[in-house]
Amino acid sequence: MYKFISLTTLLFFFKFSIASKILIPMDNGEQNNHLKAYGIAYWVLQNDIEIEWLLNYRGGSFLIDYFKTIEEECIIRGVSYDIIADVQANQIKTIISDPEVNQQVVKLQKAPKIAVYTPDGKQPWDDAVTLVLSYAEIPYDKVYDSEVISDQLMKYDWLQEQDDEDKREAIRLGLDPPKRKNKFTLYL
């Protein structure tokens, strides 16, 4: 019995001693909380840790160097993850690098500064974009006409307008959708 416990303990520690990556799968059935997973990716970038975004691999999974704090944050937020060894990570990247496969590794290095084009006084649950960002725990600023006119958009890496679904819902309910002369989503 003692040998079995010692062998089990040894295998457990061996598994984690060679594990150096966290794989956050994004495929359906594997990821418990897709929005929170995006929030984890943003949080990691805020902490100056590079992420490899595996486009078209298991739903666009994220590959991150292993840190205990990242693993703990995944647990706290209810995000599914796998701890894998460098060898496994390299095998995944080899599969992705095949020119016959429509997949790619994109390195993410900086958390973008995000703004949402929405009027003051709107609550996060009033529009789908702010609701999603709030739930995912991704920080954003609200901007509206006065910020646009005063040329403050250059402070942001990403500007997202109100969701079209919200406009359709307003029309369905007999309300006037927000009126703007220009419809835009600006990626700076």
Where are these regions (language model features)?
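Residue-level detector of anion-binding/catalytic polar loops
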Residues: E50, S80, P139
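N-terminal signal peptide c-region/cleavage motif recognized by signal peptidases
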Residues: F14-K15
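Short amphipathic alpha-helices in soluble, non-transmembrane regions
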Residues: I70-I83
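N-terminal, post-signal-peptide region of Sec/Tat-exported proteins
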Residues: H34-E73
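Non-catalytic propeptide/linker segments at domain boundaries
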Residues: S80-A111
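Helical hinge/lid and interdomain linker segments adjacent to catalytic or ligand-binding clefts
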Residues: I22-N32, F62-E72, A115, P119-L188
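Bacterial N-terminal signal peptides that target proteins for export
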Residues: M1-S6
